[in-house]
Amino acid sequence: MAVSSEQHELSHFKRTQTKKEKFNCSEYGNRSCPENERSLGVRVAMYSFMAGSIFITIFGNLAMIISISYFKQLHTPTNFLILSMAITDFLLGFTIMPYSMIRSVENCWYFGLTFCKIYYSFDLMLSITSIFHLCSVAIDRFYAICYPLLYSTKITIPVIKRLLLLCWSVPGAFAFGVVFSEAYADGIEGYDILVACSSSCPVMFNKLWGTTLFMAGFFTPGSMMVGIYGKIFAVSRKHAHAINNLRENQNNQVKKDKKAAKTLGIVIGVFLLCWFPCFFTILLDPFLNFSTPVVLFDALTWFGYFNSTCNPLIYGFFYPWFRRALKYILLGKIFSSCFHNTILCMQKESE
């Protein structure tokens, strides 16, 4: 989720703000890009790192999308949630991260103000949508592990459809509504002239909307995930203590629950590690008079993006079915007739 890279200019714009609708931008460079102070070596290194992250995000999530869509054995409620999350992360990597890479390295926005709003709306929507999907997966695993007898009646395809509708519609309405109304900038002195004269894609949140974004986009879903994981972890430990008294099929269920709890714990841990610094900075920045350094904002933004890079790597590491599906994709076997009925895993591996 990109944030503005023009905080250091805002204080200067405040001192020269006028009530006129048109601004004389001559002293601000007439929207021309400032000279890039980074050396060629630094820029090449930044492009290489960011391009690598984009490559993994796009093709890792694309492999997940193809795997779940193609192989019938993977058509389960849980995997439909993972499929939708992979689509979200794929779109973030394909449509947002390349523009963010150019802006971050060149310290300039080349694509105009109208596209800036469209870009930032999708950036904000996809980032929050990805987070909402992680929360939905946690809810799914909560019922599967803590209430296994009720799972098939509670987590049905219609329920998954409603969850997915919520995951996409709420972030979309929030992002496009806030960005195109420019409500996020109400009360920020100098913002109008910053938009009119700067060479960036300036989006910065005031105290109200910075707090709202932090609470709705991070704190609430994050708290839900941590609480759910705590309950799952407690139940899996309780099951593990009774492992010696169980039959083999029950023993396998306990092992599956333990693995699911471990995987979910890693997913939540990576989410908190990647997104907390970015959201916390957005929350604090308006209270600090927008004094956060540009380089720090860019670094935290890419740290958040990295969550979408990590998701397919986590599932690929912990789920054998994904590794087998990826192998078949790379070998081109999915183009064979009826190969979609291939058994990728035993039932105990499929969840």
Curated annotation (Swiss-Prot):
Biological process, per Gene Ontology: G protein-coupled receptor signaling pathway
Keyword entries, A-Z: Cell membrane, Disulfide bond, G-protein coupled receptor, Glycoprotein, Membrane, Receptor, Transducer, Transmembrane, Transmembrane helix
Taxonomy, superkingdom: Eukaryota
Stored CDD domains: 7tmA_TAAR2_3_4
Transmembrane segments: 49-69, 80-100, 119-139, 163-183, 208-228, 264-284, 300-322
InterPro entries: GPCR_Rhodpsn, GPCR_Rhodpsn_7TM, TAAR, TAAR_fam
Gene Ontology cellular-component terms listed: plasma membrane
Free-text tissue specificity from the UniProt record: Not expressed in the pons, thalamus, hypothalamus, hippocampus, caudate, putamen, frontal cortex, basal forebrain, midbrain or liver.
SMART domains: 7TM_GPCR_Srsx
Entry remark concerning the domains of this protein: In addition to the well known disulfide bond common to G-protein coupled receptor 1 family, trace amine-associated receptors (TAARs) contain an unique disulfide bond (Cys-33-Cys-197) connecting the N-terminus to the extracellular Loop 2 (ECL2), which is required for agonist-induced receptor activation.
Family membership: Belongs to the G-protein coupled receptor 1 family.
Function (record text): Orphan olfactory receptor specific for trace amines. Trace amine compounds are enriched in animal body fluids and act on trace amine-associated receptors (TAARs) to elicit both intraspecific and interspecific innate behaviors. Ligand-binding causes a conformation change that triggers signaling via the G(s)-class of G-proteins which activate adenylate cyclase.
Protein name: Trace amine-associated receptor 2
Originating species: Homo sapiens
Chain's gene name: TAAR2
